[in-house]
Amino acid sequence: MARGIFITATGTDIGKTYVTALIIKRLRETNINCGYYKAALSGAERRDGKLIAGDANYVYNIANIKGDPNDAVSYIFQQAVSPHLAAKLNNVEISMERIKKDFYSIKNKYDYITVEGSGGIVCPISTGKERIMLHNIIKIFKLPAIVVADAGLGTINSTILTLQYMKEKNISVKMILLNNYNHKDIIHIENKGYLSDNLLIPVYTCNKNANNLEIPVEKLIEIYEEI
């Protein structure tokens, strides 16, 4: 049976894709068959008439996953807006059945599957015939989660609010990862210390522009759960 994890964040442009790529890369470098999936992607580039799922393309390149990155994303939109708005603008009805079908198809190819969210944890995926929020996808696949947060000013507030929302939705959070971390920045140091001291969740860091995660592979493997 495959094992999975969901990567979400405290907001948009925090570094989910970057962290997701490094996690998958770390596992694949130890010969763990780890794949990638994303339900909806906005802000895709158009090349030669074809939309390119930029986030998936980045992950595939960094983690050395073979195949077409577009196959790892159910819905790809050009407009850089929330998925539900992109779907409206393109007259597309987002379906949970399609998301489930695509997810299980990819899951069957890998021993480990890393699912990346869109935006922050409170993200509308569809407001059409089906009303789908990001947390609905996490719940239907029974995935635990990693929360990616920026290491800088304001992260205590945004991280704790994100965790509170996830607690209300009964989503298990296995790890907090502070991105763009600077070991010499007093704010970053204090933020990590405060979160570590006040939460019952492990807090790790990822240095800015790092090529690898410093998290032990064993710790990453532990947080993936059977799905």
From Swiss-Prot:
Function, as annotated: Catalyzes a mechanistically unusual reaction, the ATP-dependent insertion of CO2 between the N7 and N8 nitrogen atoms of 7,8-diaminopelargonic acid (DAPA, also called 7,8-diammoniononanoate) to form a ureido ring.
Catalytic activity entry: (7R,8S)-7,8-diammoniononanoate + CO2 + ATP = (4R,5S)-dethiobiotin + ADP + phosphate + 3 H(+)
Pathway the protein contributes to: Cofactor biosynthesis; biotin biosynthesis; biotin from 7,8-diaminononanoate: step 1/2
Residues that, per the record, bind ATP: 13-18, 55, 116-119, 179-180
Keyword Magnesium: yes
Residues engaged in binding Mg(2+): 17, 55, 116
One Pfam family from the record: AAA_26
Keyword terms of this UniProt record: ATP-binding, Biotin biosynthesis, Cytoplasm, Ligase, Magnesium, Metal-binding, Nucleotide-binding
Quaternary state and interactors: Homodimer.
Enzyme Commission code(s) on record: 6.3.3.3
Subcellular location: Cytoplasm
Cofactor requirements of the protein: Mg(2+)
One Gene Ontology term, aspect cellular component: cytosol
Protein name in the entry: ATP-dependent dethiobiotin synthetase BioD
Sites where the protein binds substrate: 42
GO biological processes: biotin biosynthetic process
Gene3D superfamilies the UniProt entry points to: P-loop containing nucleotide triphosphate hydrolases
Gene Ontology molecular function: ATP binding; dethiobiotin synthase activity; magnesium ion binding
Keyword Metal-binding appears in the UniProt entry: yes
Entry similarity comment: Belongs to the dethiobiotin synthetase family.
Main location: cytoplasm
Organism encoding this protein: Clostridium botulinum (strain Hall / ATCC 3502 / NCTC 13319 / Type A)
